């Protein structure tokens, strides 16, 4: 099984994506959209079969939510992806320092 750390996560603002690449070339990713009304909507998460059940989705969720919330404190970070909503509810204590995270 591959191991990942924070340096494994790539943020690509031009495509509004956070991702982790596997050796096979597959990617786990989270898409977001910067809206005109001072919000950032994290709307989609996808993990390839080889990454399911490994915790990579949660790792990617935590990193992307925290990074966007910290870098955009004057904007509201909206979690409209059902996976991210579930992850956030289950791990709310990790995000207590971020007052700009909301559920869709």
Language-model segments: which ranges?
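Conserved GNAT acetyl-CoA-binding A-motif
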Residues: 66-82
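Conserved acetyl-CoA-binding loop-helix of GNAT-fold acetyltransferases
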Residues: 53-66
